[in-house]
Amino acid sequence: LLACLFGNGRCSSNRDCCELTPVCKRGSCVSSGPGLVGGILGGIL
């Protein structure tokens, strides 16, 4: 659950990801929304 919350979940498609990080990008779940979390995750990945 923590891995999912922090966007570290491995994925092959968006449906493998959780609500807070619903988009699969380069094999990892990331946030698709605007704001601090999305910006940080987007910057790292």
Curated annotation (Swiss-Prot):
GO terms for cellular component: extracellular region. It comes from the Eukaryota. PROSITE patterns: OMEGA_ACTX_2 (PS60017). The keyword Disulfide bond applies. Transmembrane segments: none annotated. It is found in: Secreted. GO terms for molecular function: calcium channel inhibitor activity; sodium channel inhibitor activity; toxin activity. Expressed by the venom gland. Keywords: Calcium channel impairing toxin, Disulfide bond, Ion channel impairing toxin, Knottin, Neurotoxin, Secreted, Toxin, Voltage-gated calcium channel impairing toxin. Disulfide bonds join C4-C18, C11-C24, C17-C29. This is Omega-hexatoxin-Hv2a. It comes from Hadronyche versuta. The lineage of its organism: Eukaryota, Metazoa, Ecdysozoa, Arthropoda, Chelicerata.
